[in-house]
Amino acid sequence: MRDLVLVVDFGGQYNQLIARRVRECGVYCEIIPYTYSIEKIKEKNPKGIIFTGGPNSVYGENTPTLDKEIFNLNVPVLGICYGDQLMAHLLGGKVDTAPVREYGKTNVTLDNSSKLFAGIEADETCWMSHTDYIAEAPEGFKIIAHTDVCPVAAMENEERRLYGVQFHPEVEHTPFGQNMMRNFLYNICGLENSWSMASFAEEKIAEIKKIVGDKKLICALSGGVDSSVAAVMVHKAVGKQLTCIFVDHGLLRKDEGDQVEKIFKEGFDMNLIRVNAQDRFLGKLKGVSDPETKRKIIGEEFIRVFEEEAGKLGDIKFLVQGTIYPDVVESGTDTSAVIKSHHNVGGLPEDMEFSLIEPLRELFKDEVRAVGEELGIPHHLVWRQPFPGPGLAIRVLGEVTEDKLEVVREADAIFREEIALAGLESEIWQYFAVLPNIQSVGVMGDERTYCHTVGLRAVTSSDGMTSNWAHIPYEVIDKVSRRIVNEVKGVNRIVYDVTSKPPATIEWE
């Protein structure tokens, strides 16, 4: 059984980032709600516990708290921000409203004789975000960091292995944060760098073999990262017992359907059924302009097509799904099981009698990509950009027609090709063309034109939650613009979206 660190969620915005930082140290961790009972925590047998930040005050009404017994488990605890204040409050320290609030980059003085700050400079920069502060540390605790306005920026009870920091070590703005995290995990908890994607894949493949036996499985394959990695992992475990159903709704990017079929059918020798359903989907979308209605129609039609194809395959016992850890955390479900009864996951019908195989439900997105590379999936597929489930239907504003799809598909292909030629693929989080349902007057040759406008969208981001518009060199934008106007029939104007998120979303619909 692998060693485990528990991250107790108190509602902070960086909670998943804390878990990712722990995993980056080669240590497995899980996020649990603060309502988890002491009995459940004992059953998990953690080697370390981390309290996250949160938006509350320890003195507020109905504020998140937990049983003080957690400090008597002889397990090292690290409290971060609110978690630090809660530790102080529960153990008899004094928490109060800070006379001066601290937000953003802050100079901090560290006592690097502490195990927590071993090997770190005494004068550092950290990221603060708090309105309350610890005015007095609990009895038995030593102050090991301070700022000009925060007398207890970090504290420790070395004997009980209890540590608290007011700042956020998990964010990039705290440069020493990951070194501090390693000190806590390795030197204080006694853990080792043993959690790797190679070992995870090996364990999971063996587990799937044991669960499935000689039964048959199906997988709804979209060509996206999550479903692709899940399908390949299960295929490596059970081979031809798995059949993948690829519903080609005609809303994919240029040549994408053919690429998916080639990679998985030929490259991995999978049983793959490709359902060419473009006419069926476009028929359902005829006359529909509202984006939410488009999404709903596409989702419902996908279910129907998938159900019809699954029904032709006979006795199927398992459904493979590419659920990943953020989905699990956000739904508040337990993370321990690789298999559970199917219950309308992903909108699939209630009466589909499958058990669910979710081989990636313990992994974050970056870990899924790493596993994909371990499994031999082509780099360009593992690192493909996010692509919405409804596909190009939400990049064609207004009614979706075959002609409009062809325009946005060709424009998008040119944009992606030129970004690749400019060597900018790894610098831009997402980039695509959109057809905003605008026509404008132009002149081509000596004739007046009245044609489509194509919008180009490119953003930089680390997680997609917020983003900035990408400052692509003018010469690249110029070349893209000229190529689209000259090579894509029915386009006479190109615009570039220079809006960040927020206020805009990345997609236009």
From Swiss-Prot:
Domain GMPS ATP-PPase span(s) in chain numbering: 195-384
Hydrolase keyword on record: no
Pathway stated in the Swiss-Prot or TrEMBL entry: Purine metabolism; GMP biosynthesis; GMP from XMP (L-Gln route): step 1/1
Residues holding ATP: S222, G223, G224, V225, D226, S227, S228
PROSITE patterns the UniProt entry points to: GATASE_TYPE_1, GMPS_ATP_PPASE
UniProt keyword annotation of Nucleotide-binding present: yes
CC per GO annotation: cytosol
Residue stretches making up the Glutamine amidotransferase type-1 domain: 4-194
Keywords for the protein's UniProt record, in alphabetical order: ATP-binding, Glutamine amidotransferase, GMP biosynthesis, Ligase, Nucleotide-binding, Purine biosynthesis
Superkingdom of origin organism: Bacteria
CDD domains the record matches: GATase1_GMP_Synthase, GMP_synthase_C
Known EC number: 6.3.5.2
Reactions mediated catalytically: XMP + L-glutamine + ATP + H2O = GMP + L-glutamate + AMP + diphosphate + 2 H(+)
Active-site residue numbers: C81, H168, E170
PANTHER family assigned to the protein according to its UniProt record, in alphabetical order: GMP SYNTHASE [GLUTAMINE-HYDROLYZING] (PTHR11922:SF2), GMP SYNTHASE-RELATED (PTHR11922)
Function: Catalyzes the synthesis of GMP from XMP.
NCBIfam families found in the cross-reference section: guaA_Cterm, guaA_Nterm, PRK00074.1
Record's protein name: GMP synthase [glutamine-hydrolyzing]
Organism: Clostridium perfringens (strain 13 / Type A)
